Amino acid sequence: MLKTERMDRVRAALRAQGLTQMIVCDPKSVWYLTGVAVEPYERLLALYLPTEGEPVLFLNRLFNVPEPPCRTVWHTDTDKPVAQIAEVVDAGRPLGIDKEWPAKFLIPLMETHPGMPVSYTHLRAH
């Protein structure tokens, strides 16, 4: 179940930092905000959280999540999930990135949208 109050607190903190969107990838933070608990290991798990609009969850089909709580973009190990994220983010606005997102995902996103402002954020999902 989507944790709307928790998301609203994170959105308020984003606005306070001048951000309008964020990629949350720490599995515990994703669980805290969505109720979806998976351990991705080396695979991509991400929650795109805009300050306005619907969040988008990016999940590998290997993860057993029968009823995701929000819009979900599924991928497999042979897909390019960063390209899927690149289609959702607003490249003209600063993007907050949580502290856990590996460079193997962040760098390709930045290469897809050169010049997109990216901010490492100290926000905690609480």
Question: What are these language model-derived features?
Answer:
Residues 25-27, 59-61, 97-101:
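Structural motif
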Residues 22-25, 97, 117-120:
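General beta-strand structural signal in soluble alpha/beta enzymes
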Residues 121-126:
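Conserved small/polar residues in nucleotide/adenosyl-binding loops
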Residues 68-69, 105-113:
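Short, aromatic/basic amphipathic alpha-helical patches
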Residues 71-81:
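Short acidic-hydrophobic, aromatic-tinged amphipathic segments that line or gate anion-handling sites
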Residues 1-54:
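Terminal domain-start leader segments
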Residues 84-88, 92-103:
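Hydrophobic alpha-helical hairpins/lids featuring a short glycine-rich hinge
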Residues 59-73:
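Compact, glycine/acidic-enriched structural inserts
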